[in-house]
Amino acid sequence: MSPARDEAVVCVHGLWLSGFATGFWRRRFIQAGYAAQSFSYPTVRQSLKTSARQLAEFAAELPQRRIHFAGHSLGAVLIVAMLAERDWHVPGKELGRVVLVGPPFQGTDVGRNLARVALGRVILGRAVQDWLAHPPPVVPLGVELGVIAGSRPVGMGRIAAPNLVPPHDGTVRVAETRVEGAREHLTLPVSHTEMLMSARVTQQMLAFFEHGAFTR
């Protein structure tokens, strides 16, 4: 289906994954008439700042005028890092709406536990350690941003943090997903991994792109 509107959605994957991981999102967005694209980046060996610059350059090259962003986990905080660094001043482009899914915005207990040991730091990679080393950036004024958290406590994160305080999605606590300045915050009964394959999640993302609000 060809896009029915002059709008694109850039989908950004999380740690240890590639653009293939956001394929379900991308297909749903294309079906809804958006020109959806998946952005891939090396999540372990590359710095957060470098990936943020590459994300901005990727979005600026798209032919559509209005650009929305959808990010999962590390991909979600990468989007915020890009916006905070560059404030999205791209000639001929308009920043659309932003949906962060399972973002460890306030840091992550799982990540902090892993970062205490050398092997854990290798597993986390540079970008996550960059994020944990500094306070969360301020979301620029005017950005229409929605957050989706999960409350199904199933995931590998519970191995690194067996005493993870509920509610959480098996990797990220709901409290860690709070973003100051967000327009909307919604918790759904999905795990951290399920977010990438959930029709309910994509329906809510599309509602936010279209109306600037989740459906309740």
Spans of model-derived segments:
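Serine-dependent carboxylesterase/thioesterase catalytic core
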Residues: 4, 9-15, 19-20, 24, ...
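C-terminal catalytic-base region of ester-bond hydrolases, centering on the histidine
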Residues: 141-216
